[in-house]
Amino acid sequence: MYQSLMTVRETQIAIKEVKTFFEDQLAKRLELFRVSAPLFVTKRSGLNDHLNGVERPIEFDMLHSGEELEIVHSLAKWKRFALHEYGYEAGEGLYTNMNAIRRDEELDATHSIYVDQWDWEKIVQKEWRTVDYLQKTVLTIYGIFKDLEDHLFEKYPFLGKYLPEEIVFVTSQELEDKYPELTPKDREHAIAKEHGAVFIIGIGDALRSGEKHDGRAADYDDWKLNGDILFWHPVLQSSFELSSMGIRVDSKSLDEQLTKTGEDFKREYDFHKGILEDVLPLTIGGGIGQSRMCMYFLRKAHIGEVQSSVWPDDLREACKKENIHLF
């Protein structure tokens, strides 16, 4: 039966250790400045992240003006707008401590309706919009993960060390070709188990089979220049997503992707106009799950062991039977 390696109190202390180390190194190595972030945005701005395009945001109106507002799902689009508003230049970027509510999240060991992540975004030049630049950025972030594991091992040697020296890059099409009989999720399990750490490139568009590896909203990532960082989780014995990131859409890729998804109505939103008219800067960015990170590096079996959220009674009871104690 599962046994946590730390008490609840020890876990809370270690969570701070994880977050403080990672935040400091992320800012230094990607040359990012911390900024304040909104909990909600106006509906008409189009700044909310609609994730896979089907999740419902929490909506409410403001008494003063009647303006319709939405609790953010993530800050994928807001960050790009902020870089423009704050006058950042190529090579400069920002990050923020993002908190969100995703009401339609399917709850399980790795998913909660409460989301906390480091959301970051950086301005790039046109010639940087390449797979090589994407991979270079992934390697920088992976280096932070490696150093974090080493740092924690010095303080908590019982946590062990599991990350391989190198992260492997593979495209979603190569995965389909390698494992044609498996579902996309099972392909992720297979490749993560084989290598320990992988970055899957190209998520959102249809593969040669006609199926997508996974859904992505049409209006933030360029589907050819994005991907997910996955580790093999030693406790769960499954693939484990730490980050979704990518080079963002330019006017050409946004035009193509909105057409593919049948979302031409979004062309009238301020944010989308800013991209289509080449007003907003070209960027790369992503989200790095804070609770996910703590769950992996502290060897936890459930995300509820590293964050406070709301869980159905039957799920809490099931966890108790497995010796999993949720916050």
UniProtKB/Swiss-Prot annotation:
Q: What is this protein called?
A: Aspartate--ammonia ligase
Which reactions is this enzyme annotated as catalysing?
Answer: L-aspartate + NH4(+) + ATP = L-asparagine + AMP + diphosphate + H(+)
Its annotated compartments are:
Cytoplasm
Q: Name one GO cellular component term.
A: cytosol
Q: What is its EC number?
A: 6.3.1.1
Enzyme category, top tier: ligase
Q: In which pathway does it act?
A: Amino-acid biosynthesis; L-asparagine biosynthesis; L-asparagine from L-aspartate (ammonia route): step 1/1
Q: Which family does it belong to?
A: Belongs to the class-II aminoacyl-tRNA synthetase family. AsnA subfamily.
Q: Which UniProt keywords apply?
A: Amino-acid biosynthesis, Asparagine biosynthesis, ATP-binding, Cytoplasm, Ligase, Nucleotide-binding
Gene that specifies this protein: asnA
- Example of a GO biological process term: L-asparagine biosynthetic process
Under Gene Ontology molecular function, one entry of this record is:
aspartate-ammonia ligase activity
Quote the InterPro entries the UniProt record gives. aa-tRNA-synth_II (IPR006195), aa-tRNA-synth_II/BPL/LPL (IPR045864), AsnA (IPR004618)
